[in-house]
Structure formats: structure tokens, C-alpha cells
């Protein structure tokens, strides 16, 4: 009964949040229902309240208050499909549906600005500016300006293409970024950058790059990048770390991109870099023993010859050379 009462409170709060002139759900009727099934039946009757319904089901699935078996027992497959709830099989859903729920092992392709919630082991192919909230062990493929939000504590796996965007909030999720897509990483999340992707990493997140494309990577707040891409543009700030040519291969790559470090960040170089900007207490560990132009209170350490370049003056002033 406590679960039912909490759901009623959530629904009433959403009714107030999304209240419009077309709103037909009555909070009095919501509060008079006696079971979760009866409550869902009442709300399902109003197709124009999809936002409220989808959020409520999503919340209860995440909290394991309801299950696939319960939904099937209460409503049946035909009823659920009619309301864009899928729990097995393959489906193609277009036409501007704003709320789709994918459960179990269902596979679905959606487009036309759809809003999708995925759970369990489902698979979602997003196109045409659709939006996905990915949970549990679901899999996604995002295309054509779609947006994906990987929810906390999930183990989602996904790929982004064609100007799509993903925000990853889970350290158990793993994303591959392709073809001009953009990724935001938080809380120890991980991504592999392919092609011309743009990555913004925060809060101990990890970025790995392939050796193709012209990726742009921004690291903040202890984020780490392992870079094997000679054309990468990497910006390190706020105690972040970039490791260039992390596999330390025999055939060293020539980095033609730009490496920037500032705000107590760390760069480890195993390859020669054409353009490097180091300032604001950043440190470079140079295993090639070639770079010697630090700026503004920064260190460049030659790791083989055990020499250090250090500048305590302003950019452009004479450098100080320290030899151990």
C-alpha cells in the first residue's frame, strides 16, 4: 500500500507539472484507486498524458516495483503495444510518438523525435532527433542528431554516429563515439573515440582514442585520456591527465594535433608532438626528450636524460634550464 500511495503522489506531482488545458486526468480519481493495476488502467485511458505515464512506469521499473510479468498479466501484449510498451520481438516505431518504453530483450527502431526509455537487455536504434534514457544492460545505436542519456548505475553499451550526442553518467557503461558525434562523460564513465568525435570528460572519466580521425577531447577534474591518435586536439585542465601514444609502440607516431595542459594537469609524452601549450602549473613527462618550452610556472621533465625545464616567469620570458 505504501508503494501505491507513493505512486499516487508522483502522478499528482506530474499532473501539476505538465498541466495544460487539454489535461483530462483528475487527481481525485487518481487518489481513489485501490491498486497499482487499477491506477495504471485509469491513466492508460488518456493517451494525451503519455509524459506522465511513461515517467511513472520508468520510475517503477527502476525501483523494481513492477515487472514485465506483472505488466503482461495486467494488460496483455496488444494493450501494451498499443501504448508503445514493448517487451519482446523486433519493432519499428515512427510517426512522432513521444514516449516509448522498451523492456526485456525487445529490439526497436525509432525516429521522428521519439522519446524512449530502455530497460533490462533491450536494444534501441535511434534516428531523426530522437531521445533515449538508457538503463540497466540495454544497448543503443544513435544516429542523425539523436540524444542519449545513460543513467547512473547502468551497464549500458552504445555507439554514437552522425552528429548524435550522448551524456554518460555511469562508470559501468561503455560507449564508442563515431562520425562527428559528441560525448559528455561524468563519474568515471568511459568512451572510445573514433573518427571526428568531440569528447568532454569530467570527474575521473576515461577517454581512449583510436588512431584515425581528428577528434577533439576536453579533460576536466581528474579525467584521463589515453591517446593513440596523431591528429587529436587534447585540452587538459583541473588536474586531468593525457598519455600520448599510450601503447608505447616501437613505431612512434608523430602527433600533428595540438596538446594543451593547464591548471595542474599532467601530460605523458611517448611521441613527438608538433604543437604543445603548457601553462598554469602543468607538468609534462617527456619520454622523447625533445620538448623544452614551458610557460607560466610549468615543468617539462626529460625522463630518459633526467633533465628538467622549468619556467617561473611570464610567457615569452627567458626560460630556466635545470640539469640534475
Question: How does the language model describe each region?
Answer:
Residues 1-324:
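Short, glycine-biased loop/turn motifs at secondary-structure junctions and
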Amino acid at each position: 500500500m505504501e508503494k501505491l500511495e507513493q505512486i499516487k503522489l508522483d502522478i499528482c506531482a506530474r499532473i501539476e507539472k505538465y498541466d495544460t488545458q487539454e489535461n483530462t486526468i483528475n487527481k481525485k480519481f487518481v487518489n481513489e484507486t485501490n491498486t497499482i493495476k487499477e491506477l495504471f488502467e485509469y491513466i492508460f485511458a488518456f493517451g494525451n498524458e503519455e509524459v506522465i505515464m511513461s515517467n511513472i512506469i520508468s520510475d517503477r521499473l527502476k525501483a523494481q516495483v513492477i515487472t514485465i510479468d506483472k505488466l503482461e498479466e495486467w494488460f496483455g501484449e496488444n494493450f501494451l503495444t498499443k501504448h508503445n510498451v514493448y517487451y519482446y520481438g523486433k519493432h519499428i516505431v515512427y510517426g512522432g510518438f513521444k514516449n516509448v518504453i522498451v523492456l526485456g530483450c525487445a529490439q526497436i527502431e525509432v525516429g521522428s523525435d521519439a522519446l524512449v526509455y530502455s530497460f533490462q537487455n533491450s536494444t534501441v536504434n535511434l534516428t531523426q532527433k530522437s531521445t533515449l534514457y538508457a538503463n540497466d544492460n540495454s544497448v543503443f545505436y544513435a544516429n542523425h542528431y539523436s540524444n542519449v542519456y545513460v543513467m547512473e548505475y547502468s551497464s549500458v553499451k552504445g555507439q554514437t554516429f552522425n552528429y548524435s550526442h550522448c551524456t554518460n553518467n555511469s562508470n559501468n557503461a561503455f560507449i564508442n563515439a563515431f562520425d562527428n558525434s559528441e560525448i559528455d562523460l561524468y563519474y568515471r564513465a568511459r568512451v572510445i573515440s573514433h573518427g571526428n568525435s568531440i569528447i568532454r570528460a569530467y570527474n575521473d572519466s576515461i577517454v581512449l582514442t583510436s588512431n584515425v580521425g581528428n577528434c577533439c577531447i576536453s579533460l576536466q577534474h581528474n579525467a584521463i585520456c589515453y591517446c593513440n591518435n596523431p591528429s587529436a586536439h587534447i585540452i587538459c585542465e583541473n588536474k586531468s591527465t593525457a598519455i600520448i601514444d599510450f601503447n608505447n609502440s616501437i613505431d612512434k607516431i608523430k602527433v600533428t594535433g595540438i596538446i594543451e595542459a593547464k591548471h595542474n594537469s599532467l601530460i605523458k609524452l611517448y611521441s613527438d608532438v608538433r604543437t604543445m601549450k603548457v601553462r598554469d602549473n602543468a607538468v609534462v613527462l617527456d619520454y622523447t626528450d625533445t620538448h623544452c618550452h614551458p610557460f607560466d610556472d610549468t615543468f617539462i621533465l626529460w625522463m630518459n636524460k633526467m633533465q628538467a625545464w622549468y619556467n617561473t616567469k611570464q610567457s615569452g620570458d627567458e626560460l630556466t634550464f635545470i640539469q640534475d
